[in-house]
Amino acid sequence: LPFISLATISALREFPSVNSSFDIEKGIHDIHSHVNLGIAVDLNQEGLLVGTIAEADSFNLKGLARKISETSRLLRDGKYGLEDVTGSTFTISNNGSFNSFITSPIINQPNVAILSTESVKKRPVVIQSQDGTDSIAIRHIGVLSLTWDHRVFDGSIALLFLNHIKDKLEN
């Protein structure tokens, strides 16, 4: 999850409308200057909480991994305060830990989008060789899905956002 989180933070910087909040009743749309990353944490099938890693964009990979682990443990142990579960600007849901293929999580309001990481599995893919012939090979494939509020940004931004994450993970 730390690698995906770091790639997501990079994409949120590139596409700031995805790192925003929207309150239709108040008529407020805020684009946030920092990434407060929400991490959906399963409470042993007894519920789910979104822990917030404040200013996640200030951490390197090792620091982010440590904060994700600490936040998850805090929530599972029930030793969290309101500040630990509020203020996220974007959420990641790690549904792949439950062996999912494609899910559509519900947006954690007032965020405007949520990323779902699915399980990585071996899948058949078509590979084109240098001479132009196709063959089938087995590769590890992971799926990312994004649910977003179309009132804030359109599908083209969502796809560019996902492609940015994909490029960061592949390179």
Annotate the PLM regions.
Residues 1-171:
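C-terminal catalytic/motor cores of large multi-domain enzyme assemblies
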